[in-house]
């Protein structure tokens, strides 16, 4: 059995742009044409083609509703969502001082369809009107793997577009590492 990867992001965006983003309806993954750069050569369970994985991304619901599910009840066990908030293993906050949206889902997923849905939904912040938005998000095997040396995917947002890569910036890595290192887990 594989372990779930972590989803973490820091996006410099105005509070108004974030509110607009939260209210927008997630568009089809077909709006981007660079999925093959990331998914090419990957392996997943089942016989789905790359095109089927791309087409399988969640769309058609408000971003706030879709993303909010990670901070509520999880299917793992009753109360998991509250546990994640209490012990700092999930957060979704706006920092007014930095003008920055920060989020983490510690036990995100190990499934490419989930990865695809998250990357498609989150990268759509690149099209919000207003001041330039920039930042990064990553799906990374931080706790159960080699960490930032082997990111599953990185989304870099700059100049009104988002691009997919495998490497975070040193600044993002330092920030995210600090977030992971300051997690508090309950003791038995």
Task: Place the predicted regions along the sequence by residue.
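Charged interaction segments
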Residues: 51-188
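Glycine/tyrosine- and acidic-biased, solvent-exposed loop/turn segments at the edges of beta-strands
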Residues: 36, 44-56
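Short, extreme N-terminal segment that most often corresponds to the first beta-strand
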Residues: 1-40
């Amino acid at each position: 059995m594989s372990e779930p990867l972590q989803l973490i992001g820091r996006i410099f965006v105005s509070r108004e742009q974030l509110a607009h983003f939260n209210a927008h309806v997630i568009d089809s993954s077909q709006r981007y044409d660079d999925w093959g750069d990331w998914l090419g050569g990957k392996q997943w369970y089942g016989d789905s083609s790359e095109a089927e994985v791309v087409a399988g991304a969640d769309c058609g619901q408000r971003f706030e509703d879709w993303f909010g599910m990670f901070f509520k009840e999880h299917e793992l066990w009753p109360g998991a969502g509250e546990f994640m908030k209490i012990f700092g293993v999930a957060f979704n906050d706006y920092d007014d001082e930095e003008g920055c949206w920060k989020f983490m889902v510690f036990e995100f997923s190990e499934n490419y369809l989930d990865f695809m849905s998250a990357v498609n939904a989150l990268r759509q912040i690149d099209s919000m009107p207003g001041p330039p938005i920039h930042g990064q998000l990553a799906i990374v095997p931080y706790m159960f793997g080699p960490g930032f040396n082997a990111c599953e995917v990185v989304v870099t947002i700059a100049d009104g577009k988002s691009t997919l890569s495998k490497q975070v910036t040193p600044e993002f890595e330092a920030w995210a590492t600090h977030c992971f290192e300051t997690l508090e887990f309950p003791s038995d």
